[in-house]
């Protein structure tokens, strides 16, 4: 997978070098390019924002900066072609198309010459809620681009125009407002990259995660068996795999009912699941 991130704070994406994502980079499973939006400015102050039309507080990020930036990242041209990746691979440039010469990027179909448009993800509190299903779907993408907004956001025309070169999704990681999109990018990038085969040492690790079956994951324990007067449940030492699986399912159901009962409406429940839930007193 190729990830490109456009931001005015490239250093904010430093965590992408570390832990499992860093390992994926080392193994060649993932390559990452972090692009400074100011590379596409034309004034001495490297301005990326202006006052909002119609008045109001804050500043809006300028289309004449964002447009060329996204054009170049999609095509692997301009400043995007010279950025230093977080690793040495340049595999993402093999199937990218040259820029047009008139300053306007050429619209492409969903596929052009057998090449699928990159996926552009725009973090915004006005977007669709980010879910595990999205992470699963995105984990199969070849090229994902994140556009990190700041201030009052990016001029909406940038998003509309980007459909000519990208498949675009506006996504929110929660019902709250952050200073910029960088934190959301770190969240979403980790959520999807960990699902790529070979990134996790044990593939079963994510198959048993919270939300994989629509439920919250139950509690986890390790040794010692007793700690500060608290015991690991006996069933986990029983050696009876069927009973352990049943206990884990019931713990997952109980936690979901207590913390996120809304999730139960979209989960396929067995008769045994329903009977267990009906008997719970929370």
Curated annotation (Swiss-Prot):
Keyword list (alphabetical) reads: Cytoplasm, Methyltransferase, S-adenosyl-L-methionine, Transferase, tRNA processing
The subunit field of the Swiss-Prot or TrEMBL record says:
Homodimer.
Q: Where are the transmembrane segments?
A: none
NCBIfam families, per database record = PRK00026.1
Q: Which gene encodes it?
A: trmD
- What is its subcellular localisation? Cytoplasm
Q: What is this protein called?
A: tRNA (guanine-N(1)-)-methyltransferase
Q: What would be one Gene Ontology cellular-component term for the protein?
A: cytosol
Q: What does this protein do?
A: Specifically methylates guanosine-37 in various tRNAs.
Tell me which CDD domains the record gives: TrmD-like (cd18080)
Record-level Gene Ontology MF annotations: tRNA (guanine(37)-N1)-methyltransferase activity
> Which EC class is the enzyme in?
transferase
Residues that bind S-adenosyl-L-methionine, according to the entry?
Answer: 149, 173-178
Q: Which SUPFAM superfamilies match?
A: alpha/beta knot
Give one Pfam family, short name only.
tRNA_m1G_MT
Q: Specify whether Methyltransferase is a keyword of the entry.
A: yes
The record's EC number reads 2.1.1.228
Q: Which GO terms describe its biological process?
A: tRNA N1-guanine methylation
Q: Which family does it belong to?
A: Belongs to the RNA methyltransferase TrmD family.
Q: Does the keyword Cytoplasm apply?
A: yes
Per its record, the protein catalyses:
guanosine(37) in tRNA + S-adenosyl-L-methionine = N(1)-methylguanosine(37) in tRNA + S-adenosyl-L-homocysteine + H(+)
Residue ranges, annotated region (Disordered): 77-114
